[in-house]
């Protein structure tokens, strides 16, 4: 074979790169998705092996004229998409299907038929980012080089597309509903026809559900006019067929009793572990951090040794919870299933495009305990659908009233913090035995993992992940009962068991802590890791300022742990300042003794500034301490410090953002608006980072 000269090699390299670009659509060098995320084989999903990624082809094959795409991180957007599909079918006769954005391609949307419509239900994740399953969709439409399959040179390639858009966001974040706003703006440049307004739901204001209900009615009216639809009386048409299988018992090895995947059911779980396939991790250590008896805060060490799971300092760990026994019993009792809890059921999608959210076959008990979000807040729209199945006329009238009057619903249900079963118990003691289980599967979202900021450094302990979590058990204003966190009380039960309690019952709750078929025995918990952009500067000599009251200190424990380890190796570590707040120094000062160890290792480079809100006549919070140390903060910012905030988004994070702008303006003799602009500039440059929740 003749030897290739340099030019030949260059030409071959160019051809190779071009071929890869063509066949992979550039995915090798696209902006990275979550490196820990996996699309995974979704149950009954549209994009299983052998299934098309061409949405137009899929709609033609299945006779659909309406597709509802969703971009969802926690399941809410997916739930809204399912509700829109169901309502469109039952009220207007649309042939609907629900579609996961990551399961389809978009290059052929320029050929989308004019007699069909596409919905886009898009949640915004974090700081204005797309959800994991919407990354490629977002990059495609917001990139500078959008290209479609059609050879037409038309400047408006999507002129045939009719679309509907609704966004899910949180106004406590700076980039409120950025996903739907940016996608809608990108669409408008391409020439499609939007039906109705681009709706926006606000979780930060607690009005997401009512925002959705208020938006969809005028949207349906506009869509009916555009597609010449006729509204009809909505009658329940099941999406799923649920049948009891008397030939199987719960002991049968093919029956799911809470296992998350088939490999877990078969006793051969294997990676890669992801949001679709958790690792059953041993809890290596657990202890209480508070010194008071009426409140709990947990420190847990989760072992990931041998799992091939990895994390980086600042990432999140997801815990897959189980519902408390009392809530499982309540739910089964309310719907007349208590005596049938161990009956085996098969669940099948009536429509070929329907995705079954629960592994099947399973039992009523397992479905409610492990797979359904039965403790979630109640949807007024879903409550209204139960009227037809009420046990008597009096109950039916009350349900109709609740479903029809949002203020009354707010008073009787929302303010009481009721879940579905509690809401129905407040109406009548009679069971709602006539409610089809298929309707409950359709109306109640799948039990979702809960995410926690990792409170350890991957440099210091790569095989163990630390969690710092306050246990929720509070009486909220207006509520007649204690509201108890689903996952934190589950973790508290595991901690109690590990520390010698044979019958743990945190706040009166019990859990199946040994898991399905005792597969979690020995104190195990299902987990996966989610990537975060909340990261230390790559140069450890750069100063950092951290603001983290309460459990908001979690990632900063990892940050400081890492900087102490780097210093011990002889690396130069820059000024490291933590503003920490809690109620009292002798009650809930998290890691109080540990900070002293890091102080010894980092010396003058570590400064911890505390704010105790209940120790003096005046409440003192971290934002007050920030203002008191304005000169220090300003000096470090001039040295290119990165500023971090972790904790409550609604109040603390918003006030810290405001105070920082005021500090910059005052210290530099600038107008207030200039200080605000400089904080925004820091955000854009990645020098102001938030890991916040509401």
Curated annotation (Swiss-Prot):
Keywords: Cell membrane, Endoplasmic reticulum, FAD, Flavoprotein, FMN, Lipid biosynthesis, Lipid metabolism, Membrane, Mitochondrion, Mitochondrion outer membrane, NADP, Oxidoreductase, Steroid biosynthesis, Steroid metabolism, Sterol biosynthesis, Sterol metabolism, Transmembrane, Transmembrane helix
EC code(s) of this entry: 1.6.2.4
Membrane topology: Single-pass membrane protein
GO terms of molecular function: electron transfer activity; flavin adenine dinucleotide binding; FMN binding; NADP binding; NADPH-hemoprotein reductase activity; oxidoreductase activity
Cofactor binding notes: Binds 1 FAD per monomer. Binds 1 FMN per monomer.
Keyword Transmembrane helix included in the entry's annotation: yes
Listed GO biological process terms: ergosterol biosynthetic process
Domain spans labelled FAD-binding FR-type: 276-537
Catalyses which reaction(s): 2 oxidized [cytochrome P450] + NADPH = 2 reduced [cytochrome P450] + NADP(+) + H(+)
Protein name: NADPH--cytochrome P450 reductase
Gene name, Swiss-Prot/TrEMBL: cprA
């Amino acid at each position: 074979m003749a030897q290739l000269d340099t030019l030949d090699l260059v030409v071959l390299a160019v051809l190779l790169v071009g071929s890869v670009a063509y066949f992979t659509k550039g995915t090798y060098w696209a902006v990275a998705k979550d490196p820990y995320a996996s699309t995974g084989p979704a149950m009954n999903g549209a994009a299983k092996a052998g299934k098309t990624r061409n949405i137009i082809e899929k709609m033609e094959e299945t006779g659909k004229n309406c597709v509802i795409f969703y971009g969802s991180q926690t399941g809410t957007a997916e739930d809204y998409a399912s509700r829109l599909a169901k309502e469109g079918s039952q009220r207007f006769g649309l042939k609907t299907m629900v579609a996961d954005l990551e399961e389809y391609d978009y290059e052929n949307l320029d050929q989308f038929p004019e007699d069909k419509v596409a919905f886009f239900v898009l949640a915004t994740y974090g700081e204005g980012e797309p959800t994991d399953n919407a990354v490629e969709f977002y990059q495609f439409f917001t990139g500078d080089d959008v290209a479609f399959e059609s050879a037409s040179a038309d400047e408006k390639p999507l002129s045939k597309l009719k679309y509907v858009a609704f966004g899910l966001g949180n106004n406590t974040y700076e980039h409120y509903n950025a996903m739907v706003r940016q996608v809608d703006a990108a669409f408008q440049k391409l020439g499609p026809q939007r039906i109705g307004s681009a709706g926006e739901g606000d979780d930060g204001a607690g009005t997401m559900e009512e925002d959705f209900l208020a938006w969809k009615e005028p949207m349906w009216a506009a869509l009916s006019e555009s597609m010449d639809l006729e509204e009809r009386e909505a009658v329940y048409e099941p999406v799923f067929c649920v049948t009891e299988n008397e030939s199987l018992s719960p002991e049968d090895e093919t029956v799911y009793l809470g296992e998350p995947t088939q490999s877990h059911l078969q006793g051969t779980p294997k990676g890669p572990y992801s949001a679709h396939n958790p690792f059953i991790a041993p809890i290596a250590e657990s202890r209480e951090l508070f010194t008071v008896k009426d409140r709990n805060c947990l420190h847990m060490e989760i072992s990931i040794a041998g799992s091939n799971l990895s994390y980086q300092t600042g990432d999140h760990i997801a815990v897959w919870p189980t519902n408390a026994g009392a809530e499982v019993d309540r739910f089964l009792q309310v719907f007349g299933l208590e005596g049938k809890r161990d009956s085996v059921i098969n669940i099948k999608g009536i429509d070929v495009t329907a995705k079954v959210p629960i592994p099947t076959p399973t039992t009523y008990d397992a479905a409610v305990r492990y797979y359904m979000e039965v403790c979630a807040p109640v949807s007024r729209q879903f409550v209204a659908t139960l009227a037809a199945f009420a046990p008597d006329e009096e109950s039916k009238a009350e349900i109709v009233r609740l479903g029809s009057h949002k203020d009354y619903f707010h008073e009787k249900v929302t303010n009481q913090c009721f879940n579905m079963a509690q809401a129905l118990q407040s109406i009548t003691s009679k069971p709602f035995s006539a409610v089809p289980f298929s309707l409950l599967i359709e109306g109640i979202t799948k039990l979702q993992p809960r995410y926690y900021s990792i409170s350890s450094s991957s440099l210091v302990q790569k095989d163990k992940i630390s969690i710092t979590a306050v246990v929720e058990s509070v009486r909220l204003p207006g509520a007649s009962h204690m509201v108890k966190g689903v996952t934190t009380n589950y973790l508290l039960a595991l901690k109690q068991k590990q520390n010698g309690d044979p019958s743990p019952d945190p706040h009166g709750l019990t859990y199946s802590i040994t898991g399905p078929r005792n597969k979690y025995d020995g104190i195990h918990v299902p987990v996966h890791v989610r990537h975060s952009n909340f990261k230390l500067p790559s140069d450890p000599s750069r100063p950092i300022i951290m603001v983290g009251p309460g459990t908001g200190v979690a990632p900063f424990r990892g940050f400081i742990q890492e900087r102490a380890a780097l210093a011990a190796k002889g690396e130069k570590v820059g000024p490291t300042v933590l503003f920490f707040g809690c109620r009292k120094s002798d009650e809930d000062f998290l890691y109080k003794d540990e900070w002293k160890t890091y102080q010894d290792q980092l010396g003058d480079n570590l400064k911890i500034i505390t704010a105790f809100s209940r120790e003096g006549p005046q409440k003192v919070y971290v934002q007050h301490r920030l203002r008191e140390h304005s000169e220090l903060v300003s000096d470090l910012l001039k040295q290119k410090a990165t500023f971090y905030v972790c904790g409550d988004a609604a109040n603390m994070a918003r006030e810290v953002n405001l105070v920082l702008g005021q500090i910059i303006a005052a210290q530099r003799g600038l107008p207030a608006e200039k200080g605000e602009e400089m904080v925004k500039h820091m955000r854009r440059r990645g020098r102001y980072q938030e890991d916040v929740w509401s």
